[in-house]
Amino acid sequence: MDSGSSSSDSAPDCWDQVDMESPGSAPSGDGVSSAVAEAQREPLSSAFSRKLNVNAKPFVPNVHAAEFVPSFLRGPTQPPTLPAGSGSNDETCTGAGYPQGKRMGRGAPVEPSREEPLVSLEGSNSAVTMELSEPVVENGEVEMALEESWEHSKEVSEAEPGGGSSGDSGPPEESGQEMMEEKEEIRKSKSVIVPSGAPKKEHVNVVFIGHVDAGKSTIGGQIMFLTGMVDKRTLEKYEREAKEKNRETWYLSWALDTNQEERDKGKTVEVGRAYFETERKHFTILDAPGHKSFVPNMIGGASQADLAVLVISARKGEFETGFEKGGQTREHAMLAKTAGVKHLIVLINKMDDPTVNWSIERYEECKEKLVPFLKKVGFSPKKDIHFMPCSGLTGANIKEQSDFCPWYTGLPFIPYLDNLPNFNRSIDGPIRLPIVDKYKDMGTVVLGKLESGSIFKGQQLVMMPNKHNVEVLGILSDDTETDFVAPGENLKIRLKGIEEEEILPGFILCDPSNLCHSGRTFDVQIVIIEHKSIICPGYNAVLHIHTCIEEVEITALISLVDKKSGEKSKTRPRFVKQDQVCIARLRTAGTICLETFKDFPQMGRFTLRDEGKTIAIGKVLKLVPEKD
C-alpha cells in the first residue's frame, strides 16, 4: 500500500492480513486509515463485533469471505461474477477470462497493482452479497456464474430470442495489460471444463415443428420441467404471470418463449433453445415457430436438427386447419425432410381436450390422414415415423405411461428418445461448421452445429467463403466449456483474427487443408412443390441452403426428369410447372458456401421460397466454375 490514494481503493482479504501488515504502512489521512489502524490494535473478536455495521463507509469485515465483490458489478446491465465462494483455493485467477474482476486466495499477499482495480468495496458488502445471491451458488459450484461471465450476450440469441446483441454493454474498463491477458486466455475452472478423455453423452438436436398453436412450446416447457431443467418455483411464477394476462394455459410455453412479444401473442417467433438430458443422451430442443410468416426461422432450426418432432393438435377443427392447404403442418414436414431430418416423431397433442377425451378413433383418424402425405414427402412409414398420443399441458405420456390411453402400448416420449439408436457421425471427416449467428464478447463468438470433423482449442481454421484465417480461443458446447468437440454438438466458439462484422450466417468454418467449395453458379435437381403459374428461365426466388439465405435466379432449364424412371428429356424445356422434376442452373446474388449432395448431403440440400411459400426443394448436382 504505497500509494496515497486512500485505502478505500482496496481492502484486506481477511483480518489475518490486516495483522500481518505493519501499522506504519497504512496511508495517513482520513477516518478510513484510522479505522484500519484501530482494527490492527484490537483483538479480532472485539474489532469484528464493533465494526459489524452495514452502513459503514470503509468496509464490513466478514471472516467467512475469502474475497470481495467489486462494487461496480452491482449495476443491472452487468452479469454477476464469482463472489466469495471458491473458498480454500489459494489461486489468483488473473487474466483467466474473468472479465469483471479477479479472485484472490485467502492467504495470498496483495500486491498494490492488483489492489487498485478493486474500486471502493464500501461498507455495504453484505448488500452486494445479497444482491448477487440468486445467480451465485454455493462454494465450488461455480458453473452458472462462470457461464454468464464468459458470454453474457449469448442470452439474447438463445434465452431471449428476438433481441439485439447485448455484447456492446461489455465489461467495465480495465487496464490495457489486463485486457490483453483476458483476450489471450479463457477461464480455467475445474468445475466447468470437460476433460477431452471423458466419456460424453451423444448430442442430439430435436426440432419441434407443426402448425401454429399445436402446442410445440408447451410440450417443450413440460419436458424441461419433467427432466428438472426448470424448477417448480419458476413454473409457478410463470403460471401467476400468465394468469394476470388471462393466458393461464400458456405458462409452460414461457419456459421457451422468453421474450415479451412471444408471450403476449402466444406465438413463437425465433427458434427457442433449451437443453435436457436422459440417461444416455444430451438433447437440444429447437422450438421452431409455427406461423407461416416465420417459416425462414423454422428452416434455420430444421437445418441444425437430427430429429424432428411434428406436433399435431387432435382438437376438433385444429387438426383440419393445420393440415389443409394453408396450414403449416404439410410445409413443415416437407421442409424438415429437405433439411436432412431422417427420423420423424409425430406427437398427437391435446388428447385431453374435451372434444377428444383420449379417443382412439380420433387418434387413428389423424394418423390415417398424415401417413400418405408423409410418405409422399419421403419418410418411410415403417422405418422413419413413430406416432404417439400425449398432452403437453398435463404431461400425460411425455415421461411416464398414461392411464388415460391404455390402448397405446409404446414407450412414452422421453424414454423413446433415450432408446433411439446412435447417429453415426464421422469424427475423421473434414471440418464443416455452418455459422448460425455471431456476436461480440471479449472477441468474436460464432454459433453453429459442427456437421463433421472435430475442433480443439488453439486450432487454426479458415472462415469461408472469405478465406479469413482464424484461431480458436475457446469452445463452449451447450454452455459447458471444453477443449475438444466432436460432430453433432452445438457450439459457441470464440475466434481470434476476425471481426464480428466480417461474418454472416451461412459462412463455414473449415480446416485450412480441406476447404469447402464456394461459388455463385451451380446445377441442381429441383421438384416444383407448389406454384400456380409456370416457371421459366429468369425466375427469381430465395434460396435456403444449410444456414445460408441468398437471392437466386434460375438462369437455365436443362432437362425434365421422369419421376418414375428417372430418365432425362433430350430437349431443353421452355418452362416447368407444379409437380414436375427438372435439372436447372442457378446463380446466386453473392458467393455462397455449398457442396454437392453426393459429397456432403448437409450442405447440398436446399429449399426455394417465393412470396412466403416453399415453391421447390432440391439438391446440388455440380458446381460450375466462374468465368474470368
Swiss-Prot record:
Residues 349-352 are annotated as: G4. Disulfide bonds: none annotated. Residues 201-425 form the tr-type G domain. Highly expressed in IUCC stage II colorectal cancer (CRC). Changing residue 55 to A: Impairs interaction with UPF1 and PABPC1. Changing residue 56 to K: Impairs interaction with UPF1 and PABPC1. Residues 1-49, 72-124, 146-195 are annotated as: Disordered. Its main location: cytoplasm. Residues 391-393 are annotated as: G5. PROSITE patterns: G_TR_1, G_TR_2. It is an enzyme of class 3 (hydrolase). Residues 1-10 have a biased composition (Low complexity). It is found in: Cytoplasm. GO terms for molecular function: GTP binding; GTPase activity; RNA binding; translation release factor activity. GO terms for biological process: nuclear-transcribed mRNA catabolic process, nonsense-mediated decay; translation; translational termination. Pfam families: GTP-eEF1A_C, GTP_EFTU, GTP_EFTU_D2, PAM2. GO terms for cellular component: cytosol; translation release factor complex. Residues 266-270 are annotated as: G2. It catalyses: GTP + H2O = GDP + phosphate + H(+). Component of the eRF1-eRF3-GTP ternary complex, composed of ETF1/ERF1 and ERF3 (GSPT1/ERF3A or GSPT2/ERF3B) and GTP. Component of the transient SURF (SMG1-UPF1-eRF1-eRF3) complex. Interacts with UPF1 and PABPC1. GTPase component of the eRF1-eRF3-GTP ternary complex, a ternary complex that mediates translation termination in response to the termination codons UAA, UAG and UGA. GSPT2/ERF3B mediates ETF1/ERF1 delivery to stop codons: The eRF1-eRF3-GTP complex binds to a stop codon in the ribosomal A-site. GTP hydrolysis by GSPT2/ERF3B induces a conformational change that leads to its dissociation, permitting ETF1/ERF1 to accommodate fully in the A-site. PANTHER family: TRANSLATION FACTOR. Belongs to the TRAFAC class translation factor GTPase superfamily. Classic translation factor GTPase family. ERF3 subfamily. This is Eukaryotic peptide chain release factor GTP-binding subunit ERF3B. It comes from Homo sapiens (Human).
